[in-house]
Amino acid sequence: MKLNWETTLLILLVLEILLFGAINPRMLDINMLLFSTSDFICIGIVALPLTLVIISGGIDISLGSTIGLCAIALGVMMQFGLPMYLAVPLTLLLGLLCGLFNAALIHYTGISPLVITLGTLYLYGGGALLLSGLAGATGYEGIGGFPDSFTAFANLTVLGLPIPLVLFAVITFFFWLITHRGRFGRHLFLIGQNPRAARYAALSVNGMPYALYGLVGVASAIAALVMVSYFGSARSDLGRDLLMPALTAAVLGGANIYGGSGSVIGTALAALLVGYLQQGLQMVGIPNQVSSALSGALLVVVVMGRSLSLHREWVRNFFTKHTRSLR
């Protein structure tokens, strides 16, 4: 029986947990498994819309800086006495505007999304540092003093499940619905597979990036809100370490770096796989630097595997040719 990739990822996730559990039995504790997701679930929150961007043939590497900018902006608004019921929607709006700005630059300049979002990565990161400096929040302290009702949010539970995990499940369902069960998703895959054919089919090839990058921006703002609530402080560097794991989750989940294919469920499972990998390595005493290096190595291996699978015929001919030459 041939397993699909999502099933394979689920099996790998279970094996990963069992492996780390054999080394450290705490890894098998159900409460630890559930509540430790709050440490890394933001990887999945931003990886889901990033998957859609990759399916379309684009990329967004500015999401980490967008998270930092949204986080510090939330802190500044709180410092100026703005109530949280206004500051939270404004933070979401800021994330949306960052995403739309990326899309507008890509649309009107025609420059590669990689180059554009590399530029905005530094633009948003610089803006976050500027706001942080103006607010007097330098170093690792950030801006604290958030209302208890806000900081308690990330520690609430619904049916015994932590709120961040429930939020991730809801966001996953939303993206699965629009990507795999609607006209939006069909248009998305067609644009990623063949933009020229999509234009001939009268699809909104130029309009699609605004929706996709806007979703990444909003998801980045949501991640910022969750992280600020969880850590109790707003810092400009909150999203610094999320880009590589999020990109790894999207590609490991099945997103084709050349566009045209991908899976929301695959990305969700891959995000848990990457997150529990980080948690497991920390629990067995592996430094964070090694964990980051392994995430990068995993991304390289997955990209190489995807590239080889796309050029399967060339690889087969290459080995056939060299095998004959050795005889």
Swiss-Prot record:
Give the source's domain of life in one word: Bacteria
This protein's membrane topology, according to the annotation, is: Multi-pass membrane protein
**Coarse class of the protein's main subcellular location:** membrane
Question: Where exactly are the transmembrane stretches of this chain?
Answer: 3-23, 41-61, 63-83, 86-106, 114-134, 158-178, 211-231, 257-277, 283-303
One Gene Ontology cellular component term attached to this UniProt record is:
plasma membrane
Q: Which InterPro entries match?
A: ABC_transp_permease
Which key words are in the record? Cell inner membrane, Cell membrane, Membrane, Transmembrane, Transmembrane helix, Transport
Molecular function GO labels: transmembrane transporter activity
- Is Transport set as a keyword in this record? yes
Compartment(s):
Cell inner membrane
UniProt cross-references to PANTHER family, sorted A to Z: ABC TRANSPORTER PERMEASE PROTEIN YPHD-RELATED-RELATED (PTHR32196), AUTOINDUCER 2 IMPORT SYSTEM PERMEASE PROTEIN LSRD (PTHR32196:SF71)
Subunit and interaction comment: The complex is composed of two ATP-binding proteins (LsrA), two transmembrane proteins (LsrC and LsrD) and a solute-binding protein (LsrB).
Tell me which family the UniProt entry assigns to this protein. Answer: Belongs to the binding-protein-dependent transport system permease family. AraH/RbsC subfamily.
Function according to Swiss-Prot or TrEMBL: Part of the ABC transporter complex LsrABCD involved in autoinducer 2 (AI-2) import. Probably responsible for the translocation of the substrate across the membrane.
Indicate what this protein is called per its UniProt record.
Autoinducer 2 import system permease protein LsrD
Which organism does this record belong to? Enterobacter sp. (strain 638)
Show the taxonomic lineage: Bacteria, Pseudomonadati, Pseudomonadota, Gammaproteobacteria, Enterobacterales
Gene name in the database record:
lsrD
